[in-house]
Design a protein with these regions (language model features):
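Acidic, metal/ion-coordinating pockets
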Residues: 22-220, 224
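Bacterial Sec-dependent N-terminal signal peptides
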Residues: 1-23
Length: 226
């Protein structure tokens, strides 16, 4: 099977160390960038012997790093909307992609990005269902306002350290979510409300992940200096 190249743009490794003393807890987090699924990647994952898909080989060199953190999170920039499986411009990858991500060490998948609505409301809902069935923590898109109010901002506690995580996108390629589905957009008023709610959960750290910018560049755009 050909190795597949998943874009891990803007990857960052964050280490939170409360104090230098070993008497205090530490938390190591890895955030990766875009996990994509173009047509060539889907074709490379096809197991012709079983007619299923196997993404294991594409992550084998990353697994030692991604599994070494206390928490590993990534931007899932595809839907798991079921067949037909397609890449750009309306991404839907096989469920086996999620299986491989879980086995590689991903704990959290962030779903607010410009491809969140590639397969409409049904795609949002099925992606959420698959992530939950596969044991992921996830945030960024929601089936309805009730689940958003109940689960967002995402609160995660590990090693005695409490995190609040917000996930936002600049847009969804001109598509609007069909109610009751919700995508977190770059809305200043809503973000301030979410930050206030996060503060009420008394996190030790608040992490805000925003999906924006141009593909295939390694520096910030002039309009995105922060």
């Amino acid at each position: 099977m050909n190795f597949m190249k998943f874009a891990l743009f803007f990857s960052a490794i964050l280490s939170f160390q409360v104090l230098c003393s070993q008497d205090y807890p530490t938390l190591r987090i890895i955030f990766t960038g875009d996990i994509m699924g173009h047509d060539s990647q889907i074709e490379s994952a096809l197991n012709t012997g079983t007619a299923g898909y196997d993404y294991t080989s594409c992550f084998r060199y990353l697994e030692p790093y991604l599994s070494s953190a206390d928490i590993t999170a990534g931007n899932l920039e595809v839907t798991l909307a079921g067949p037909p499986y397609k890449g750009y411009p309306a991404f839907s990858s096989p469920d086996e992609l999620g299986t491989a991500l879980h086995e590689t060490g991903f704990d959290i998948l962030l779903t607010a990005n410009n491809h969140a609505l590639d397969r409409g409301r049904a795609g949002v809902e099925r992606t959420i269902e698959q992530l939950e069935q596969q044991g992921f923590i996830h945030t960024g898109t929601f089936k309805n306002a009730f689940t958003r109010a109940l689960t967002y901002p995402l609160i995660v506690e590990k090693n005695g350290i409490r995190l609040a995580i917000l996930n936002i996108t600049y847009g969804t390629n001109g598509l609007s979510p069909e109610p009751p589905a919700i995508v977190n957009y770059l809305d200043t008023i809503q973000i301030l409300e979410d930050l206030e709610k996060a503060s009420g959960a008394r996190p030790d750290f608040t992490v805000v992940t925003v999906h924006w910018g141009l593909s295939l560049i390694h520096i910030s755009e002039p309009t995105r200096p922060y």
